[in-house]
Amino acid sequence: MTLDDLKSNSMKDQPDEKSNGDKAEGPRSLSTLRWRPAALILGLLCLGLLVTVILLIIQLSQVSDLLKQQKVKLTHQEDILEGQALAQRQAEKSSQESQRELTEMIETLAHKLDEKSKKLMELQQQNLNLQKALEKAANFSGPCPQDWLWHEENCYKFSSGPFSWEKSRENCLSLDAQLLKINSTDDLEFIQQTIAHSSFPFWMGLSLRKPNNSWLWEDGTPLMPHLFRLQGAASQMYPSGTCAYIHRGIVFAENCILNAFSICQKRANLLRAQ
């Protein structure tokens, strides 16, 4: 056996390292090939989850923005509603005040109307009374004749003239009267007021009589000293007589022959006045 044969045999007896190496690497290659699809799927799933998370974050951001906008709108609406409520409360308060003022005004007007109604009724009653008085006056001829003045129980007429005392007395008699007689201070005041604006003297029914030289009225009654005091020739007896006249409220004694106006007097017809 030669050396070449020994080398050839020894080379045949050595294991094939390449073959063994290939055999060792074979299982690992198969394992790697098996995990690659799973890793790919897992990566895809992670990518999908990442995309989903990103989308969710975007949607949440959008929802958050939308919620913020809605909150702003709601806040604005609340402000508007609060303003409207405040305006409504103010309007109600103003309406209540206006209603109260209107009620007070109505009550005041009603009170005034009631007073006016009472006043109107009083005026109507006064008008009715006046109409009755006018009707009564229309049927009333009066206690004194026409052109005579009525005072208490007597009628007075300021006659034309002037005439002497005697002529004046006759004129009064023709009128169914007598010359003026003063019975009281009230009568004197009435005559004084009536002739206050006259500058003429007026004969009275008072004269100085004999035998006692007393001042007597035409009906024979004496002069009452407290009524008035005679001025002038109160104690002088003239041939034609001494008579009294009134001038500007003062009574004078003078000659009966002198001319003056006169005041006639007679009783008033009080029964006819009733």
Swiss-Prot record:
Its main location: membrane. Residues 89-142 form a coiled coil. Pfam families: Lectin_C. N-glycosylated. GO terms for molecular function: carbohydrate binding; low-density lipoprotein particle receptor activity. Residues 13-26 have a biased composition (Basic and acidic residues). Glycans are attached at residue 139. The chain crosses the membrane at residues 38-60. SUPFAM superfamilies: C-type lectin-like (SSF56436). Residues 1-28 are annotated as: Disordered. The keyword Transcription regulation does not apply. It is found in: Cell membrane; Membrane raft; Secreted. It is a lipid-anchor; Single-pass type II membrane protein. Residues 151-265 form the C-type lectin domain. One of its GO terms (cellular component) is extracellular region. It comes from the Eukaryota. Residues 61-274 are extracellular. The cytoplasmic region is required for subcellular sorting on the cell surface. Homodimer; disulfide-linked. May form a hexamer composed of 3 homodimers. Interacts with HSP70. Receptor that mediates the recognition, internalization and degradation of oxidatively modified low density lipoprotein (oxLDL) by vascular endothelial cells. OxLDL is a marker of atherosclerosis that induces vascular endothelial cell activation and dysfunction, resulting in pro-inflammatory responses, pro-oxidative conditions and apoptosis. This is Oxidized low-density lipoprotein receptor 1.
